[in-house]
């Protein structure tokens, strides 16, 4: 139950990140500068936490470990952040979160191809994994493309983006370009690859805090170089007490700091599919927050898609829990057999006892 609660909190935090990113982009902030500052602040925030809570787990800083941290930073932060933020400016917060539910499908396909996730189509668990993942993606597609009647949950007259509302277009699909959609999907593929990478390398970093810190540090070096090549105007690098600074602080401390560490811990304990399947929860949260703060409109398709997504989530969780129980039962059975054999061997008479 602890890991499920952790992943729900992660999705709430990630949903808030999409809202902040949208506001920062509307304020004209350069995506590469945002990512560079985010990783710099995250590294400075996480270093003392590592020495306070995981001093004894500090890994040996070899060239191989730093290269793995660089690869993790590229796949987990730099590439998805730049692609998603750039795509977000061409789409919407709700679409970006909705596209994120493709992450479980991509993760499941890659994990199955690499034999990191068992898929037995002849068993109920295997079928539940496949159909649960597909239902989740199907629910997201319904959420995006089926409009239906308009549903007003509340009327706050709040619109933080400060853009005039166009009633002729649906809020979940307006300003969505093909380029923006491709950028967002590219970011999701990068996240899926990062999930799978974490399965192989997470234990080599000593602990989730060191994992997040080294990932942010090495990714930050690359992000800073990209930002310096992309943005030469010094005014774009100046920070004030505005939405840009708030977005950077939120992304650095809560997301790149704590959320990355929690994700690494859950991937190590429950696997990449378990983590990625919670992506649809973020879609529901963004839809509700978007309708409340960004004056986005919910429709019947949003409600139907949400129901399908939640149902799919429960199907996959059921499959994962049943699989975990089966693994624990098998492990206990093997341990019992081993102990029984040891006792039998120890009770056998030795050669010396038969000698008069």
UniProtKB/Swiss-Prot annotation:
Subcellular location, record wording: Membrane
Record keyword Membrane present: yes
GO cellular component terms given for this protein: membrane
Key words of the record: Membrane, Repeat, Transmembrane, Transmembrane helix
Molecular function GO labels: transmembrane transporter activity
UniProt keyword annotation of Transmembrane present: yes
Bilayer disposition of the protein: Multi-pass membrane protein
Domain of life assignment: Eukaryota
The protein, known as: WAT1-related protein At1g68170
Lineage: Eukaryota, Viridiplantae, Streptophyta, Embryophyta, Tracheophyta
């Amino acid at each position: 139950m602890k890991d499920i609660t952790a992943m729900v909190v992660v999705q709430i935090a990630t949903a808030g990140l999409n809202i902040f990113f949208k506001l920062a982009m509307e304020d004209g902030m350069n995506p590469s500068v945002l990512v560079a500052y985010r990783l710099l602040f995250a590294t400075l925030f996480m270093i003392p936490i590592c020495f306070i809570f995981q001093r004894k787990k500090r890994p040996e800083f070899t060239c191989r470990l730093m290269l793995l941290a660089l690869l993790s930073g590229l796949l987990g932060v730099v590439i998805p952040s730049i692609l998603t933020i750039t795509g977000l400016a061409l789409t919407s917060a709700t679409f970006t979160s909705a596209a994120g539910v493709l992450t479980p499908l991509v993760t499941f396909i890659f994990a199955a191809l690499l034999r990191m996730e068992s898929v037995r189509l002849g068993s109920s668990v295997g079928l539940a994994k496949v159909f649960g993942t597909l239902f989740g993606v199907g629910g997201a597609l319904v959420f995006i493309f089926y409009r239906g009647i308009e549903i007003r949950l509340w009327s706050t007259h709040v619109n933080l983006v400060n853009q005039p509302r166009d009633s002729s277009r649906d809020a979940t699909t307006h300003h969505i370009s093909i380029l923006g959609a491709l950028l967002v999907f590219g970011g999701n593929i990068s996240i899926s690859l990062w999930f799978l990478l974490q399965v192989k390398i997470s234990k080599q970093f000593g602990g989730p805090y060191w994992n997040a810190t080294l990932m942010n540090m090495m990714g930050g070096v690359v992000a800073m170089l990209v930002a310096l090549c992309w943005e030469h105007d010094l005014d774009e690098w100046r920070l004030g007490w505005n939405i840009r600074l708030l977005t950077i602080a939120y992304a650095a401390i809560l997301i790149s700091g704590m959320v990355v560490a929690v994700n690494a811990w859950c991937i190590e304990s429950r696997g990449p599919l378990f983590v990625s399947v919670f992506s649809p929860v973020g879609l529901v949260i963004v839809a509700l927050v978007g309708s409340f703060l960004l004056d986005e409109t919910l429709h019947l398709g949003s409600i139907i898609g949400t129901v399908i997504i939640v149902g799919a989530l429960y199907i996959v969780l059921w499959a994962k829990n049943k699989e975990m129980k089966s693994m624990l039962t098998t492990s206990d059975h093997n341990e019992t057999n081993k102990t029984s054999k040891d006792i039998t061997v120890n009770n056998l008479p030795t050669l010396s006892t038969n000698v008069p």
